[in-house]
């Protein structure tokens, strides 16, 4: 096991609606909730933070929200204007998993993106 917890953000319908509505080219294939929640970004956090997840989210939701939005559109003019905790909660479900087992016999490499 590793000394981290995993936070997984899953989109709710309003997030997907924004992705489709904000598309500046209007040529996307119609992104769906099901297709986009199959492979989600995983954020590793301290085990201690997982025990106080609501507090951790309150401190970090802005960065998480912007990271998820920027994955779709880098043009900030397309981003929702009032990115507050209420909107975050309406658009995104948060899962936290505290048992992570590394099954690979090799060094973890951070590509520093």
Residue ranges of each PLM-predicted region?
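Short, extreme N-terminal segment that most often corresponds to the first beta-strand
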Residues: 1-25
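Extracellular structured ligand-interaction cores
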Residues: 4, 40, 85
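Generic structural hydrophobic/aromatic packing signal, biased to beta-strands
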Residues: 7-9, 42-45, 65
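Amphipathic protein-protein interaction modules
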Residues: 46-110
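A generic structural signal for short, non-catalytic loop/turn and secondary-structure boundary residues
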Residues: 1-2, 35-38, 81
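Amphipathic alpha-helical interaction modules
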Residues: 18-60
């Amino acid at each position: 096991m590793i000394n981290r917890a995993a936070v997984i953000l899953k989109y709710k319908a309003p997030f997907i609606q924004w992705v489709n509505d904000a598309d500046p080219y209007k040529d996307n294939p119609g992104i769906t909730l099901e297709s986009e929640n199959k492979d989600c970004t995983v954020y590793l956090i301290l085990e201690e933070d997982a025990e106080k997840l609501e507090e951790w989210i309150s401190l970090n939701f802005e960065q998480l929200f912007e990271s998820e939005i920027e994955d779709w559109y880098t043009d900030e003019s397309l981003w929702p204007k009032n990115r507050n905790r209420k909107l975050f909660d309406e658009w995104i479900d948060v899962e936290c998993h505290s048992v992570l087992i590394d099954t690979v016999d090799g060094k973890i490499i951070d590509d520093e993106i």
